[in-house]
Amino acid sequence: MGNEKYQQGKTKNCLQYYILPQKEFGEKMAAIVVKRGANHIFWKDKYGENIAFSAGTAHFIEHKLFQQEWGDAFTAFSQNGASANAFTDGDKTVYYFTCRDKFVENLHLLLDFVQNPYFTEKDTEQEKSIIQSEISMYADDPAWTVYGQMLEMMYENHPVCNAVAGTAETVEKVTAEALQKAYEAYYTTEHMVLICTGDVPVKQIRMAAEKVQRHQSDMRVYFPMEKKEILEKYREKEMGLSCPCFQIGFKFQPVPKEKWLQTRIAMGFLLEILAGESSSFFQMAYERNLLDEPLGMAFFCGEGYAFAAFSGIGEQPEETAELLAQELKYLQKNGLPQEDFSRIRKKMLGRFLRRMDSPVSLCMGQIEWAMMEKTAADVLYCIKTLPMAAAEKLLQNAFCKDTMILSVVK
């Protein structure tokens, strides 16, 4: 990762930071991670009273923070030769920039606008139509539709079943006052992380981080109780596609935070063995003309939820799902092949090491690892040392046909 040793720590005002110098690169990147996202809509105040923000509130704040009283932060970054952006998902909101020059100036700009919201009723009302247009665009996308439909079939109460941007109706309910209240709950310093990669000035970064003021809140997030069972096994929606797209999902029990890293890596091994390009499942699916290419595979876990998803395009989604279930049953009966496990370990190590090859990919990786309070070294060690028994245990205990879902868009 470069000649200078990485640094991690916490400022006197509780801002966590990871500085990952890469002296061989001209490109630099910085990100502020707020460990609050679309799933964090249910809160209790200091008196124990329940407060619920509208679905899509975290995403709305992300849009609005770039609009400052002094002007547009995007424009300011551009004038400094930087490219800035942001994104929100269920668990976090991330603001970042990349540049080659004026890194410190851009870092100060990033830290400044994230700490200083400027919400007015006029600007909030104007933003609603922009976000509602974005929601409408996603609603017309079959891939987003089939994924969202899968989550609705899995979860009844947990906000993970909501679209990150909310709906046109929930966005309409947002007010400047509600945004300010949500900002004060979400953007506490102890839930924020600064990450810097590339040929960056470590001392100046630490000085800038120490100047970040402490923000605290007496509000506490909570998640409604969610039953173990799924709500539906099969649902399809008609969108006039020439070939159906589908998501095969498995709902799991929530994973304790201290086990997130090992579970994610163990699940990575499992998904590759079960349905990767070299798997028996894909070879059979290809020979039977069920699939032309391997399924997309992903595992997600966070506060109060965990699930795996397999995405694909094919004329016979139900037959594909049944074949996957049969392969899963076979592996549960016969165990994971040692050869496959060793091969995938090498593949995952290669993929991980390639991530070190650019400031952007390393920063994006550390964004995910910071959510688990881990570093690249922790991830590398886990990939190298994960015992096959850990993946076997997941195989036997997590996957169950009773919590298997098929979401289809035709």
Predicted regions mapped to residue ranges:
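Short, flexible turn/loop "capping" segments at secondary-structure junctions
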Residues: 24, 86-90, 161-163, 184-190, ...
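Acidic/histidine-enriched segments that form metal/cofactor-coordinating
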Residues: 69-182, 292, 322-329, 336-376, ...
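PAPS/PAP-binding and catalytic site of the sulfotransferase fold
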Residues: 107-110, 194, 205-210, 320-328, ...
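His/Glu-rich zincin catalytic helix
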Residues: 1-73, 180-284, 403-410
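Helix N-cap motif at beta-to-alpha junctions
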Residues: 99-104, 198-203, 313-318
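A structural supersecondary motif
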Residues: 247-254, 273-314
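Flexible, glycine/charged-enriched surface loops at secondary-structure junctions
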Residues: 219-224, 293-298, 334-343
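Second-shell loop/turn segments in exported
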Residues: 47, 64, 94-98, 118, ...
